[in-house]
Each structure stands twice: as C-alpha cells, then as structure tokens.
C-alpha cells in the first residue's frame, strides 16, 4: 500500500510539472531602429516612439517543418497590441514567412501583412522562432519568440 501511495504522488507530481505554464516574461524597454524579441504576453515600451507593443501570441503556424518535404510552406500568424498612453490597446494580426533560421524576408509578400503603420512608425516582423522541425504542432504556444523592429515612417 505504501508503494502505491508513493507511486501515485510521484505520478501526480510528474503530470503537474508537464502541465505547468511558464513564468510570464518581464516587460522590456527598447528604442526605434533596434531589433527586439518578445514572447507571448510580453511587452516592449518603445521609448522614443512613446508606445508599447505586446505580443499576444502565435495563433497559427503553417511553416513546413525542416525535416519534412512539403509542396507548400505557409506563414506563421500572430496577434499583437499597440498602445499609446493613455489610449486603449489596438489589436493587429500579422503574418510572416520565414526561412529555416526563423528570419523573415525584408521585402513584402502580396496578401501577407508582416508590417503595420502606427502613429508615424512602421512595425515590422524580423523573425519567428523556433522553427518547427518534425511536425507543425510540436512547438508549444509559450515557446514562440517573435522579433520586431520599429522605424520612423
């Protein structure tokens, strides 16, 4: 009976560890013309542009896994909010193609919104990591990191 109880406790602890959510990422401060990276729920105050960008999360990842041959590789889609104090946050959905290193191309693609204009600035996606290796659903939501750059329009 004692062994069964110990086994049950260990099994419960193992399941709890696997289902735990990571600690939220701390907000960062950055400036225009500087690439920065956010995780889901994390925000960056763009000091010289006087607004905040928050990555809500990746909503869809259709990139072809690196170890699989695909006919087509799709974009990764994610949601951000932009907020200029004291206003309300405005939500945007962006998409980007990436190479296997997770870097986004510099040029725009027709039908893909990888940049937006906001308050006289351009917010552009620079990369999305990690890149899936074996399956499209192997990356956990909290593992994603999206890199941006903010430039004056």
Spans of features found by a protein language model:
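Sec-dependent signal peptide recognition
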Residues: 2-8
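C-terminal motif of bacterial Sec signal peptides marking the signal peptidase cleavage site
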Residues: 13-16
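Bacterial signal peptide processing site
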Residues: 18-20
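Short, low-complexity, disordered segments immediately C-terminal to signal peptides
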Residues: 22-32
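Post-signal-peptide N-terminal segment of Sec-exported extracytoplasmic proteins
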Residues: 36-71
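Mature extracytoplasmic domains of secretory-pathway proteins
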Residues: 62-65, 69-109, 114
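Acidic, glycine-rich flexible loop segments
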Residues: 107-133
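Short, exposed beta-strand-loop hairpins at the edges of beta-sheets
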Residues: 128-142, 147-149
């Amino acid at each position: 009976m004692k062994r069964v109880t110990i086994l049950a406790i260990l099994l419960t602890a193992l399941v709890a560890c696997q289902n735990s959510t990571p600690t939220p990422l701390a907000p960062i401060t950055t400036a225009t013309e500087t690439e920065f990276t956010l995780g889901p729920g994390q925000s960056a105050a763009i000091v010289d542009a006087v607004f905040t960008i928050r990555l809500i999360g990746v909503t869809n990842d259709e990139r072809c896994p690196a170890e699989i041959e695909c006919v087509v590789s799709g974009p990764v889609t994610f949601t951000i909010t932009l907020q200029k104090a004291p206003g309300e946050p405005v939500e945007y959905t962006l998409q980007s193609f990436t190479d296997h290193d997770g870097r986004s191309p510099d040029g725009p693609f027709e039908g893909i919104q990888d940049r937006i204009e906001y308050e006289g600035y351009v917010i552009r996606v620079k990369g999305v990591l990690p890149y899936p290796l074996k399956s499209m659903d192997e990356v956990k939501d909290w593992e994603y990191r999206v890199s941006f750059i903010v430039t004056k329009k």
